[in-house]
A protein has these predicted regions:
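Short glycine-rich, Thr/Ser-proximal phosphate-binding strand/loop in the N-terminal lobe
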Residues: 2-45, 58, 78-79
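Phosphate/pyrophosphate-binding loops at sites that engage ATP/ADP/AMP, CoA/4′-phosphopantetheine
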Residues: 44-63, 101-105
Length: 114
């Protein structure tokens, strides 16, 4: 059965989960987003750390990300800063996470995912 790591990135919290894509959550958690106090790099490090943990526990098939900010969905790059995530613009989220996990990644604005 397929497993997907999914993230909902907001200004204050990041919701993380592993799902089978059919509505069953194998694991889920809510973490404080460190971007406001420690910078975007700390947020990226947290995402990569969770991906590695999830990948150890479950055979992952892909990664899905819903995030605050304007997203170029084709490239998975943050096209415009999110008001609550400083210096987010230009972050190549899709590339970073794909390279870290070796998996396909989809990134979209969180409102479009609701």
């Amino acid at each position: 059965m397929a497993n997907y790591a999914v993230f909902d990135i907001g200004g204050t919290a990041i919701k993380c989960a592993v799902t089978d894509g059919g509505g069953c959550f194998r694991e889920k958690e809510r973490l404080v987003n460190p971007a406001r106090t420690e910078g975007v790099g700390a947020m990226i490090a947290l995402l990569v750390h969770r991906l590695r943990d999830y990948g150890t526990a479950y055979p992952l098939t892909g990664i899905g990300v819903a995030t605050a900010g304007v997203v170029d969905a084709a490239t998975g790059t943050i096209a415009c800063d999110a008001m609550n995530i400083p210096d987010y613009r230009g972050t190549r989220l899709k590339t970073i996470l794909s390279e870290a996990a070796g998996l396909p990644v989809a990134v979209e604005n969180d409102v479009n995912c609701a």
